[in-house]
């Protein structure tokens, strides 16, 4: 469909909770396709509608071998007490990385493009990406959850040791 322009990190849409999708129609299908096209053009792992200036609870995550995960009005149903601290970043904040502690396992309820309710259990990296993107749709950047922001030198070392 179309590669959309990303809003800058200072855009007010990124600080507000996105609106729930109420109508499951062709405009939602176009939005999901635009998110996919833009995500791949930006070489990102995930993207949500507010990042392309649409205040809707719609996101897409590239789960690599498992394919694309489309999230519409996602809600966390439960999450494990067991956590993992790992590096996070965002295309909205290029060159900014932080260590964020998140649940190791989550159960999320969402809807598919046709309005059917789906529930999925996600672990580790996928759980982290879902939690990150839901935060983003709720106006919470990963930097607010970060235990600490890393220096350029620390980020370099992190990728070398990974």
Curated annotation (Swiss-Prot):
InterPro entries named among the record's database cross-references: Peptide_deformylase, Peptide_deformylase_sf
Coiled-coil annotated residue ranges, if any: none
Family: Belongs to the polypeptide deformylase family.
Molecular function in Gene Ontology: peptide deformylase activity
GO biological process per UniProt: co-translational protein modification; translation
Name this polypeptide is given: Peptide deformylase-like
Pfam family, one: Pep_deformylase
Organism name: Staphylococcus aureus (strain Mu50 / ATCC 700699)
